[in-house]
Amino acid sequence: MNISVSMNKFDSKIKFVQLVFVDINGMPKGMEIPASRLEEAVTDGISFDGSSVPGFQGIEDSDLVFKADPDTYVEVPWDNVARVYGFIYKDNKPYGADPRGILKRALEELEKEGYKAYIGPEPEFYLFKKNGTWELEIPDVGGYFDILTLDKARDIRREIAEYMPSFGLIPEVLHHEVGKAQHEIDFRYDEALKTADNIVSFKYITKAVAEMHGLYATFMPKPLFGFPGNGMHLHISLWKDGENVFMGEEGLSEIALHFIGGILKHAKALTAVTNPTVNSYKRLVPSYEAPVYISWGYRNRSALIRVPAFWGKGARIEYRCPDPSANPYFAFAAVLKAGLDGIKHKIDPFAYVEENVYEMSEEKRKELGIETLPGSLGEALEELEKDKVVKEALGDAYKNFINYKWKEWESYLEYLEEKHMPKDTKKVTEWELERYFFL
């Protein structure tokens, strides 16, 4: 968007603009400026202190600059404010640990190979009543695809969907999920950077609308023990010269198969990025439709990578382990880098399955070469430290990310020891609720 055009878009009611970026956890951060300073924010940028932003700079060298991306300008329909995403700079150069900048660089690498990535997410969330405690209360007892009286939140879902186009999101399917008070609103796929922005916007819209109704919306992977977890399946395709290169004559193309091979090869390390919280691994357990075993198959929802039954230009893969606690910019960069590694090195996919992996014997899984995803954040971080490709995907953010996450894991272990709880507990602790409920 031309800067002058963006300035002309102002509604007379818009007095302030929110400059939005995310921290290492994917949590939105930012500041507001008078609307009259938007052009300055685009051309020169607005300086800020990065030392208090998780995963950014130390206090001894904390000066950063936010430059607005005018193509992301939107006006919030329930408030007299606009929002804009952007990129972060340090010393007049792109800041190496900026999550949005990291994804941009990963996409530039993909484009050098001639590819453009499109991603469609399926973020799930729970709605809870506000009661001032961590005794979470559910406002409805609906189940999967319920549309009658059990689904008390259908009007809230509709309201969220009605606001989405104002932020550039196109809602496609709204429905109650498997868990009581659990919901999903799918929106149309887009280019990877736009989709990452859209995930941040979708969380913002959902939480704001829930707040209007006196409820909390949480994207925490596993807010309730014994209930289904919140996932964020990613539907991914690569395009070249306007054509979907995942499309083969009979099923997927060789490029798509190698892309799958790359993700399977790096799957263990990827979980540290796509499932980056202690709580993530309480969702990744058998029997809740969350993938645990590193495998792939056509139409098979027990596999880590599923190929949906759509061909032609709709050819794509579905990566099923990510959850909404992931920083979408990091997650997309890492997954695409892993897939590109598969294409470059012609990595054939392994562990193909047609049957339910959960019901297989351990011997059968071993025979098919099916391995298991890490069972905890600590295990995932160990795998990340050994994986050059995924580490490189995080760029200059890797050091901050790995240090931050190890401290997170150690803090959790200290909590368990203090509470005399086993290290492998699958119960959801108050430590997790306090840390992840508002992600």
UniProtKB/Swiss-Prot annotation:
<feature type="binding site">
    <location>
        <position position="318"/>
    </location>
    <ligand>
        <name>Mg(2+) 1</name>
    </ligand>
</feature>
<feature type="binding site">
    <location>
        <position position="124"/>
    </location>
    <ligand>
        <name>Mg(2+) 2</name>
    </ligand>
</feature>
<keyword id="KW-0963">Cytoplasm</keyword>
<keyword id="KW-0436">Ligase</keyword>
<dbReference type="GO" id="GO:0005524">
    <property type="term" value="F:ATP binding"/>
</dbReference>
<dbReference type="InterPro" id="IPR027302">
    <property type="entry name" value="Gln_synth_N_conserv_site"/>
</dbReference>
<feature type="binding site">
    <location>
        <position position="306"/>
    </location>
    <ligand>
        <name>ATP</name>
    </ligand>
</feature>
<feature type="binding site">
    <location>
        <position position="283"/>
    </location>
    <ligand>
        <name>L-glutamate</name>
    </ligand>
</feature>
<dbReference type="InterPro" id="IPR004809">
    <property type="entry name" value="Gln_synth_I"/>
</dbReference>
<feature type="binding site">
    <location>
        <position position="233"/>
    </location>
    <ligand>
        <name>Mg(2+) 1</name>
    </ligand>
</feature>
<feature type="binding site">
    <location>
        <position position="301"/>
    </location>
    <ligand>
        <name>ATP</name>
    </ligand>
</feature>
<keyword id="KW-0479">Metal-binding</keyword>
<feature type="binding site">
    <location>
        <position position="184"/>
    </location>
    <ligand>
        <name>Mg(2+) 2</name>
    </ligand>
</feature>
<dbReference type="GO" id="GO:0004356">
    <property type="term" value="F:glutamine synthetase activity"/>
</dbReference>
<dbReference type="GO" id="GO:0006542">
    <property type="term" value="P:glutamine biosynthetic process"/>
</dbReference>
<feature type="binding site">
    <location>
        <position position="177"/>
    </location>
    <ligand>
        <name>Mg(2+) 2</name>
    </ligand>
</feature>
<feature type="binding site">
    <location>
        <position position="320"/>
    </location>
    <ligand>
        <name>L-glutamate</name>
    </ligand>
</feature>
<comment type="subunit">
    <text>Oligomer of 12 subunits arranged in the form of two hexagons.</text>
</comment>
<feature type="binding site">
    <location>
        <position position="172"/>
    </location>
    <ligand>
        <name>ATP</name>
    </ligand>
</feature>
<feature type="binding site">
    <location>
        <position position="229"/>
    </location>
    <ligand>
        <name>L-glutamate</name>
    </ligand>
</feature>
<feature type="domain" description="GS beta-grasp">
    <location>
        <begin position="12"/>
        <end position="93"/>
    </location>
</feature>
<dbReference type="GO" id="GO:0005737">
    <property type="term" value="C:cytoplasm"/>
</dbReference>
<dbReference type="GO" id="GO:0046872">
    <property type="term" value="F:metal ion binding"/>
</dbReference>
<feature type="domain" description="GS catalytic">
    <location>
        <begin position="99"/>
        <end position="439"/>
    </location>
</feature>
<dbReference type="InterPro" id="IPR036651">
    <property type="entry name" value="Gln_synt_N_sf"/>
</dbReference>
<feature type="binding site">
    <location>
        <position position="122"/>
    </location>
    <ligand>
        <name>Mg(2+) 1</name>
    </ligand>
</feature>
<feature type="binding site">
    <location>
        <position position="289"/>
    </location>
    <ligand>
        <name>L-glutamate</name>
    </ligand>
</feature>
<keyword id="KW-0067">ATP-binding</keyword>
<dbReference type="Pfam" id="PF03951">
    <property type="entry name" value="Gln-synt_N"/>
</dbReference>
<protein>
    <recommendedName>
        <fullName>Glutamine synthetase</fullName>
        <ecNumber>6.3.1.2</ecNumber>
    </recommendedName>
</protein>
<keyword id="KW-0460">Magnesium</keyword>
<dbReference type="InterPro" id="IPR008147">
    <property type="entry name" value="Gln_synt_N"/>
</dbReference>
<comment type="similarity">
    <text>Belongs to the glutamine synthetase family.</text>
</comment>
<feature type="binding site">
    <location>
        <position position="237"/>
    </location>
    <ligand>
        <name>ATP</name>
    </ligand>
</feature>
<dbReference type="InterPro" id="IPR027303">
    <property type="entry name" value="Gln_synth_gly_rich_site"/>
</dbReference>
<dbReference type="InterPro" id="IPR008146">
    <property type="entry name" value="Gln_synth_cat_dom"/>
</dbReference>
<feature type="binding site">
    <location>
        <position position="313"/>
    </location>
    <ligand>
        <name>ATP</name>
    </ligand>
</feature>
<dbReference type="InterPro" id="IPR014746">
    <property type="entry name" value="Gln_synth/guanido_kin_cat_dom"/>
</dbReference>
<feature type="binding site">
    <location>
        <begin position="235"/>
        <end position="237"/>
    </location>
    <ligand>
        <name>ATP</name>
    </ligand>
</feature>
<comment type="function">
    <text>Probably involved in nitrogen metabolism via ammonium assimilation. Catalyzes the ATP-dependent biosynthesis of glutamine from glutamate and ammonia.</text>
</comment>
<keyword id="KW-0547">Nucleotide-binding</keyword>
<feature type="binding site">
    <location>
        <position position="301"/>
    </location>
    <ligand>
        <name>L-glutamate</name>
    </ligand>
</feature>
